[in-house]
Amino acid sequence: MGSLTGRVVVVTGASRGIGKGMALALGAEGAFVYVTGRTTTPGSHPLPGTVGETAAEITRRGGTGVAVAVDHANDAQVAVLFDQVRQEQGRLDILVNNAFSIPEDLTEPRPFWEKPLSNWEMVDVGVRSNFTAAWHAAKIMVPQKSGLIVAISGYVGVTYTYGVVFGTCKSAVDRMARDMAVELQPHNIASLSLWQGLTFTERANRNLARNPEMKKLTVTNPLIGCSPEFPGRVIAALAMDPDIMRRSGGTFITAEVAQDYGVTDVDGKVIPSLRAERGAPIWRPIA
């Protein structure tokens, strides 16, 4: 029996990438995991993965996976998701806000005025979507007087990376997690933000293949980067912490939280913090 058996989880944006990895890690601990995403048909996205495939793998690993097709820019679809969770489970223990609209030109070294104005859609699905999902989740969590809401962010919150909109989004979700914590504290619900570094997702692996110099860096320094499941393993540890409220409102480097709990990556590797190289979080816990 896993450490999260009986826990109900929603992971947004889990067709592939970090979202899929986190969902698999939480499912491997026995959780009942609702996974959301827009990709339902194999081959309909340039990168592999569907929500159905993620859900099926969760179940194979010992959890229970349920795929729900959701466009997180569509408020009505998000409402249906949380209605389904409420009706089927009657509770929600963990919300992982991961859905993010990633433009194809995100990593291109061009200034903001030379990129499409549509890149602002990262704010719609990346900031507003976090708020919308948390708004619905809180309506389930507050009556039960428990819950954990996790935002997925990164060092980009304080260090310039990939342009103006990307940094704006991640800074915003860090602050949102803190202010939500203030309002959720009386209800015993924790809200926090986790900073990820390089994660070997399908997209990252494709980009590394196109950038030999960056790929060489990961080979010469094997400690750089982690699997998509690593943050999910950390979230599982957070969820099992009986004193989780002491962290509420804070922004944390995932690697440092992992070291606090003795969590390693799937291959046993200890992921290092990049605090010295990339910067430190601004927001401390409110407690």
Model regions: which residues?
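C-terminal helical subdomain
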Residues: S193, E213-A287
